[in-house]
Amino acid sequence: MIKNTHRKYILEEKRLPSVTEILAIVAKPYLIPWANRMGLQGVDLGEYNAEFTGLGTIVHGKIEAYYNHYAKFDDSQYPEAMRQKSDELFGKFLNWESEREIFSIFNELPMICDKFGGTIDAIVEMDGKITLIDWKTSKEIYPEYFGQLSAYFYLMRHGKPMEGDEELEHQVREIGKKVEQVAVVQIPKDGEPVSRIIPIQSDEFKVAWEFFSASLKLYNAEKEISKLKSPR
């Protein structure tokens, strides 16, 4: 059975929506033809998505273990075929990483603010620039990934670690002031890793934040309007 990796974000006993929950409110029309093709091929989308999520979890875990110098990520609960595929993808990551000068700062860092929560995959110094990274095992780099990264950047500047003391909070804030760019690093099943980098000061990053902000407003509005159900 594949482990449920959804994390709950709590502030003063109040559950906060996650960044991915908020972005899920946005329609993704590009998924409709894909789902149709998968259905015509007889693929069970529930099983496919569970496998995709499981593979991503293992790869994330192995990258975290690598940067934190753990002995090994425990993937024993996952199917053998998935473990073998994750080894292949992790090998691709190592090849990608070997071509860059990367120093790890934080990994898998759960953050919260008064509006939402989210877990930052990695904050590193990459080729001399402090970079906020999100690892993806998806087939493509989708635009909303940068909305996700803009939310994580907001959390670094205005939020705090969900766990830890004031010293850690101070460290994260100080590093947040030095972040120069965000990057999506795609490690696909087929093909080699691809990275897309956007500077914090760019128009593209501004648009990414506007996209997330609009998604957050829509998420909150949907919660409110759902209360207007017809009386029984």
Can you name each region flagged by the protein language model?
Residues M1, P231-R232:
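Short, Lys/Arg-enriched, disordered terminal segments
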Residues K85, L109-S230:
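Nucleic-acid nuclease catalytic cores
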Residues M1-G117:
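Metal-dependent nuclease catalytic cores that hydrolyze phosphodiester bonds in DNA/RNA
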